[in-house]
Amino acid sequence: MSPTQDGRYATKVPDGLDKIITDLPLRVESVDVKGKFMWWTLTGGDKTWYMWSTYGMSGQWSRTRGKHAGFIVDFNGSGSLITRDQQQLFFNDTRRFGTVKFVSDPKIHAKKLASLGPDILDQPPVDSGLFAERILLKPSRTICEALMDQSCVSGIGNYLRAEILYDCGLDPWRSTTDLTAEQYVQLRNVSIRISTASYKSQGASIKTYRNPDDVKGSSQFSFKVYARNSCPLGHETTRKQDTNARMIHWCSICQK
């Protein structure tokens, strides 16, 4: 593989790119994820590199070059993960919050992975006790803030947060210390169930979503409150920014 810059990185070099260039070409050994964090393991000679990728709000890897392709990976030779004779992958990112970074130090890579909480899609699933313990790491926060903190539990994004809290009947602005043990068990179970349903349906049909073949979502995962004017019971939904400027969607009648 070899990289090409464009879009976001047309003038700004991704961290580590200047160092990995001298070791190219490299072989893609694997592509892995933990929560919303993706990394590629690359090898060549006696060197191992890791290409980190975060999606931001709209980033995605695709076989099709989009209008906002910020980074391009060229595949030349055997060992490519790309099928159908496709020789390139494009990191398309409309809002340009996604990132690409190259790391060769295995200790730095291990530290990054250790900084992330258990993946909500882990098998076997994270147990209820550990789930509550991770959410309560910073007890002064609201439950909507804690669910989005990838160091607590990784893999829950904005639309999942809204749907999980609605199904649990929990007001997003409640303190993490206000929840009972039974509510934490429910929150853990619902988080796993809804995250799994979203994963199996290959995401949501929001306007920016495309799968790697550039196919729009098919509405298999439907929202109850996220981006809705009313909840399934007909109550008007409310939207408000959290402390990280992310919009939280909820029903003030159904969620207490």
Say what each PLM segment does.
Residues 1-112, 248, 256:
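Acidic, proline/glycine-enriched N-terminal capping motif
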Residues 24, 75-77, 86, 123, ...:
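Short linear motifs in intrinsically disordered/low-complexity regions
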Residues 55, 59, 111-114, 119, ...:
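Flexible, active-site-adjacent loop/turn segments at secondary-structure boundaries
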Residues 70, 88, 110-113, 128, ...:
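Hydrophobic, well-ordered secondary-structure segments
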Residues 85-91, 115-123, 142-150:
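Short, mixed-charge, low-aromatic patches
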Residues 92, 101-103, 128, 158, ...:
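A short secondary-structure junction signal
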Residues 95-138:
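A short, charged helix-loop
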